[in-house]
Structures are given as C-alpha cells and as structure tokens.
Amino acid sequence: MIRFNNDYNHAAHESIYEAMKADQANNYPGYGADEWCTKAAEEIKKLIGREDPAIYFFPGATQANFVVCAAALNSIQSVVCPKTGHINCHEAGSIENTGHKIIELPSTEGKIMAQQVRECASSYFEHGEAEYLTEPKLVYISFPTEYGTIYSLKELQELHRVCKEYGMYLFVDGARMGYGLGASVNDVTLKDLAELTDVFYIGGTKCGAMFGEAVILVNEELKRHFKTYMKQNGAVLAKGWLLGLQFYTLLKDGTYFSITKKADEQAIRIKEAFHKKEILEYMGSYTNQQFVILSKEQEEKLSQKYIFELDGVLPDGRSVVRFCTSWSTTDEEVNELVQDILAL
C-alpha cells in the first residue's frame, strides 16, 4: 500500500540522521540550554529578520498550541478560532482543559476574516454586561489551514490591524509552515509573520524533522514565565539538543524549504489529475493537502492500492477525502497515483 494519508509517516530527512550520527559522541546540558538550540534560534532569527523574539523548541504541535494559549490568557479570557481550526477539532479539548473557552467562528475554506474578528471583539466590548462573558483575547489561525488553503498577505495584515485595535494577540499555528510558504500562490514570508503576529511557530514534525516545533514569541508580553508554563505542561524535553540539532540541520541550507516545496509541486500534479477526470475539489488548495469528492466506486477503487483519509460524507453519499503528500513522498509514488486517477 502507498500512503497519502498524512505528512508524518516517515521518520526524518536523511540529513538529520547524518547530523545525529556525527554528533553521537558529544554530550550537552539538558532542557534546551545547549549550543544546538542556540544555533537553531540564530538561524531562525536570520530568516525572520529580527533579533528580539524569544524562541522555544517543543516536542509537538498540540503542546505548542495549548502552552501558548495557557501562557497568553488569564482565567476570564478566551480564544477565537475558525470552526475548522485544529485546536477546535483535533486536540481532544486541550485548550478547554487549560480552562479557556474557544469561540468558534464560521470558516470559509478553512479561514476566518478580519471583519469576523472585529464583529466578535466589538460585540464583547460594546456588550452592556461584558462582565458576564469571557474576553476574546487571542485569535488562533493556521498557515496553511486544515484544508490546505493559505492566508494572503493582505488578509494577514487585516487580521493584524483588527487584533491591534482591540488589544488581541494573533497566534499562527505553523505545523505545516513549510508547505504554506512553498505554495505557488503564496505571498507571505517568515519576515511578514514576524511583523504581523504576536506568536507563531515553524513546524518540524510534518516538515522533515523526526519531531519538533519552533515557537517564536514576538510580543514581549508573552515572554514572561513562558518556559515555566512549558515545564508545568510537560513540554520541555530533557534532551533538548535533539530539537535544536534538527532545526539547525533543516534550516541552515534551506533543506526545510526545498523538501516542502517539492511536496506542494507533487500535490499539484495530483490535483491536476483529478481535474482532468472532472473530479471536483472540496477546497481550492495549492499546498500538500488535496481534498476531493469521490463516488463510492472511485473511493473503493483507489483504496485498493492507496491509503488516504476520509474527511466526511456528503448528503448524496459521496466522500470527501484527503490526499496528502509530504517531504518524503517520491515521484514514483505520485506517478502511480496519477496514472490510477486517470484510469478511473
């Protein structure tokens, strides 16, 4: 069986194995106080064009999401996010478990717009009895979204302005950051994210690392006691240098960006094959996740050779499925899938 079900079904890019092997004889202090984490943070600061952000390395993305929210909010504040947001649908109530309410907003192709956030914030601040409500304080979005779509620079700028107007934090989940940056339609850079957000992260687990996410704290207000929140929530890895080594290895020569861009290009080949067969897209994605609508017969035929993800069933019985390429997907695997799509 050929896997197109996710972007974390191989361990790590070969350059990471080579770096780990070369470093095997060395030893380091624990908990991120090592030279690899320092070097990785320096690489990230070069990429974002700023020296002032604080950078912390997490083992996983769910940990990054709930620690950021826990550290940013007090007990009467809440998170605003798309209805389809990862923290709302795929994290087992981790945000709610920190004691914070999620205010979900209707999403269009996985995104929420500045006007929606404005309406949410203004309804709170203009409410006659706001003391009986939670204050919407942090806006959570992801880049790319759960459906592989991406925010334009203009959309991010508008969200940034609204957040500043109402004193809200803008938090960008970047678990698939490489695939978003590598999309052919993308006009957002890491430097833009460092200017427009209060906190964001560069994902490693889904983008070539064995594990790990690099959280970039831009807003000074979020830095105080942040590592204490990490430790309190089990997010500080004792062997922290393994995180730093991986990020330094992937970022120092652009490997992170080249391998994720290739996965996007492979996904577009799959997208085009479905187009040729007049099979409808569910969302207009230009990243490594492609969502299409298949008949039961088409789904059964492809599932004989490929593993892909069922996202939902439409009222007429057709299936919404996801085909996901990754940094480890081979051209041969894509060639086979394209041929079988065209043979449907």
Pin down the residues of each PLM region.
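Hydrophobic beta-strand scaffold residues
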Residues: 102-103, 170-172, 281-282, 309
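Conserved PLP-anchoring active-site segment centered on the Schiff-base-forming lysine
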Residues: 71-89, 118
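Conserved N-terminal alpha-helix of the aminotransferase class I/II PLP-enzyme fold
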Residues: 14-61, 83-88, 94
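PLP-dependent aminotransferase-class I/II
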Residues: 99-144, 151-158
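Catalytic PLP-binding core of fold-type I/II PLP enzymes
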Residues: 151-183
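Active-site C-terminal subdomain of aminotransferase-like
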Residues: 108-109, 135, 142, 150, ...
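Conserved C-terminal alpha-helix-loop-beta "cap" of PLP-dependent enzymes
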Residues: 75-76, 268, 273-342
